Regions:
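P-loop (Walker A) phosphate-binding loop of NTP-binding proteins
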Residues: 51, 85, 153
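Walker B catalytic acidic pair
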Residues: 50, 113-114, 125
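Conserved beta-strand position immediately N-terminal to the Walker
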Residues: 46, 110, 148
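Conserved alpha-helical scaffold flanking the Walker A/P-loop in AAA+ ATPase domains
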Residues: 35-38, 91-111
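Pre-Walker A (pre-P-loop) alpha-helix and adjacent loop at the N terminus of AAA/AAA+ ATPase modules
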Residues: 7-51
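Walker A/P-loop
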Residues: 40-77
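Canonical AAA+ ATPase core
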Residues: 92-97, 118, 122, 130-229
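Short loop/turn elements that form and flank the Walker-type P-loop nucleotide-binding site
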Residues: 34, 41-43, 67, 86, ...
Length: 237
């Protein structure tokens, strides 16, 4: 546990800095970025649903870059197996012992790209991790970082070769966000800003800088827990 503490004013300032960094690379989508920040501070997971070309994957990459968190990306495909996500215990012939080979889920911010393109058996590999922030392999539980956050994406247009997420999986997400197409003005700005790039730029190429670290993110989430929730608000919810 970090010894760093933050006030709510400092949390607000940090959130503004993160918005600013993501805004250097992502045109528009401010509501989506705000929801990502909310989920981060509430320690919940996010499902981004939108058509191709709405910067879902790139937005998650920029978000991770600004936070300074460990980042992994898994491209979900029909042949992806649970072990490709979680890892496995492999026998070491030199030591005659099993050695844990950690999968990409052992990170702080996991981008589960096109999560609905993999079968339910593989989707289920995320259930324990998202609910309990741990992974069990061969009967042994392995803790995930306190800041563990899953940002998943899916394309609602495709109907061939996709596997709709079951209710148990959807329940693990705090938010399902519908990512819209950019406006005409935003599209013009995207062309002006990125039209000269031969391929998709990286966040660092567009000036996205780290403004936080794991300890700061944990402290910010802890500070948010101090907000008083009035009974009238509870009744409204």
């Amino acid at each position: 546990m970090s010894d760093i503490t933050m006030t709510l004013a400092e949390v607000s300032n940090l959130a503004a800095q993160i918005r600013g960094q993501v805004g250097k690379a992502v045109v528009g989508q401010t509501a989506t970025v705000d929801a990502l920040l909310t989920a981060l501070l509430a320690q919940g997971h996010v499902l981004l649903e939108g058509p191709p070309g709405t910067a879902k994957t790139f937005m998650a990459q920029c978000f991770a870059a600004s936070l300074g968190l460990d980042f992994s990306r898994i491209q979900f495909t029909p042949d992806l197996m649970p072990g490709d996500i979680l890892g496995s215990n492999l026998f070491n012939f030199q030591t005659s012992q099993f050695t844990l080979t950690r999968g990409p889920i052992f990170t702080e911010l996991l981008l589960a790209d096109e999560i609905n393109r993999t079968p339910p058996k593989t989707q289920a590999a995320l259930l324990e991790a998202m609910q309990e922030r741990r992974v069990t392999l061969d009967g042994t539980a392995h803790a995930l970082p306190a800041n563990f956050l899953v940002v998943a994406t899916q394309n609602p247009i495709e109907s061939q070769g996709v596997y709709p997420l079951p209710e148990a999986q959807l329940d693990r997400f705090l938010f399902k966000l519908l990512v819209p197409y950019p406006s005409a003005a935003e599209e013009a700005k995207i062309i002006a800003n990125f039209g000269s790039h031969a391929g998709p730029p990286r966040p660092a190429q567009l000036g996205v800088e780290k403004v936080a670290d794991a300890a700061m993110v944990a402290a910010a989430a802890q500070a948010v827990k101090s907000v008083t929730l009035a009974d009238t608000v509870i009744d409204y919810i």
